[in-house]
């Protein structure tokens, strides 16, 4: 998305242009703490708004079912090569439209309906596509779920091994949507080998940390690795499948197309190439380190203010605040922080007595605001703002003060200052 594109949009569809401008203003004026969100570079936005959106390109580079693919072949191959270099993978498929699509392709390649899969329970930090009963993965396969220890709120690898011996899964899944600690992929490899299972790592949340060396890389241990390309990787919304096994790579390629998708989104693949290129630069390693430092600063500040953190803190980009310590639900906390222009999300905590629509937790993450330039001191201030807001839930004066402090931070660290749509925002 460039100024020129926005000008065209404002001229041809001012109604939609106003909506996009409204969303731009919302992003500028809020502290974005949703752990799965980030702000892409202008270059990523530009690639997604390019003429590549016009091209159909079923198949793989140099193996297409349509003519005229010489340039999209080069763009897609660039994305593949950069993904392989970034993660140290022998094979990469950059076509999945999303992380869920990447996971489904792996399931199609490795499993038959009725096979057993084993992943983390959603309420403990897993993901819908890892066997939740409301997801197709929970309908097509027999599912066994593991969770965290009730004592440490961390993975208990001995318990996972015992469950795997009992259930004998064909596919063991590690990688999560709300787990704040380091994942020991070597221990999962040993468990998978013990029971003869394939091992899949879904690193959608931690991909940027893995790519930059701030989290162990699963590729030496896992048969297949899937991820999204946004979140900590700071690219466009999309998916990616990687493996070091050439034969499995061929199966995954077929499972993506024609197995689960038709034509790839070449404009998004080009944006993935941009993001992978950015992540290969030294600046990205610095950024990822700051993401972790900022998350730990926020977690420590909340802990000092009396809040309980699931597992006691964080090793990565996210944390879970257990709000039962202040007799508050996640739904209530989500609403309160939204009123002071902080965007977060309610989230279940391990062994949560509340429903998923209410929850006892609040999930917070540092990637987006780290992209805007905030550092440790600013994240400590964010911790104090959140604490002041939640601990004084009925005090309007405190709420107003918190809102002003949020505004001050947003003003100090502007977002996309070059972008603007010359149309009024809709009421």
From Swiss-Prot:
Cofactor(s) this protein requires: pyridoxal 5'-phosphate
Keyword list, A-Z: Amino-acid biosynthesis, Cytoplasm, One-carbon metabolism, Pyridoxal phosphate, Transferase
GO MF, one example: glycine hydroxymethyltransferase activity
Enzyme class: transferase
Transmembrane segments: none
Residues at which (6S)-5,6,7,8-tetrahydrofolate binds: 122, 126-128, 247, 355-357
GO cellular component: cytosol
Enzyme Commission number(s): 2.1.2.1
Localization of this protein: Cytoplasm
Pathway: One-carbon metabolism; tetrahydrofolate interconversion; Amino-acid biosynthesis; glycine biosynthesis; glycine from L-serine: step 1/1
GO biological process: glycine biosynthetic process from serine; tetrahydrofolate interconversion
Annotated signal sequence range: none
Catalysed reactions, as listed in the record: (6R)-5,10-methylene-5,6,7,8-tetrahydrofolate + glycine + H2O = (6S)-5,6,7,8-tetrahydrofolate + L-serine
Site location (Plays an important role in substrate specificity): 230
Any single Pfam family the record assigns to this protein: SHMT
Main location: cytoplasm
Modified residues (N6-(pyridoxal phosphate)lysine): 231
Assembly notes: Homodimer.
Functional summary from the UniProt entry: Catalyzes the reversible interconversion of serine and glycine with tetrahydrofolate (THF) serving as the one-carbon carrier. This reaction serves as the major source of one-carbon groups required for the biosynthesis of purines, thymidylate, methionine, and other important biomolecules. Also exhibits THF-independent aldolase activity toward beta-hydroxyamino acids, producing glycine and aldehydes, via a retro-aldol mechanism.
Homology family: Belongs to the SHMT family.
Name of the protein described by the UniProt record: Serine hydroxymethyltransferase
Protein's organism: Crocosphaera subtropica (strain ATCC 51142 / BH68)
